[in-house]
């Protein structure tokens, strides 16, 4: 329990997808739906499937938030986001709407996905510049930003500046509500 969310395996000349339901990955949960779509991504992407089949790629236990730096995992995440948040429908849902955190929360509920998965999809196909930062204990683990995000260089890896809201949170343990202007 808790060791992985999903894994795609090839053994005995068969593919199988393992979903860790003990880790909150039920079929109707945001995490479970996305995990299943992510693992299907490994099967759908020819290079992943063939590499697993030939033994060039070892089965990798996917864990939410710990995979985004790995290009193989990002490829599978992209396929997953396309499956659970189709581009045309997603763009129809955002057209004419003001960008703020409430929009991301609305889309997250609409598509039954996590807020982070929804924000990353927004960075891929949305209509407003956005950067997503994932950090643990004040250390940046990964970032994702839209092509039109102008301030990519403001992030000072690996530590978060205390001048950012996230930095204030890690430095002073102060939770700050974000307004649309801060975004």
Predicted features by range, described:
Residues 1-183:
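Active-site hotspot residues in diverse enzymes, especially metal/ion-binding acidic/histidine motifs
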């Amino acid at each position: 329990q808790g060791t992985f969310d999903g894994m795609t395996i090839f053994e005995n000349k068969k593919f199988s997808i393992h979903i860790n339901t003990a880790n909150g990955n039920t079929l109707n949960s945001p995490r479970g739906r996305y995990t299943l779509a992510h693992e299907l991504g490994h099967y759908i992407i020819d290079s992943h499937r063939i590499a697993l089949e030939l033994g060039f790629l070892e089965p990798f236990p996917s864990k939410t938030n710990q995979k985004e730096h790995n290009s193989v995992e990002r490829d599978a995440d992209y396929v997953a986001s396309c499956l659970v948040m189709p581009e045309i429908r997603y763009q129809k849902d955002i057209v004419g709407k003001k960008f703020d955190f409430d929009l991301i929360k609305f889309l997250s509920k609409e598509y039954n996905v996590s807020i982070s998965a929804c924000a990353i999809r927004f960075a891929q196909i949305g209509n407003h510049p956005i950067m997503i930062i994932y950090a643990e204990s004040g250390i940046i683990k990964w970032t994702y930003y839209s092509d039109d995000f102008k301030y990519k260089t403001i992030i000072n890896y690996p530590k978060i500046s205390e001048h950012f809201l996230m930095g204030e949170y890690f430095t002073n343990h102060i939770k700050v509500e974000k307004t649309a202007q801060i975004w």
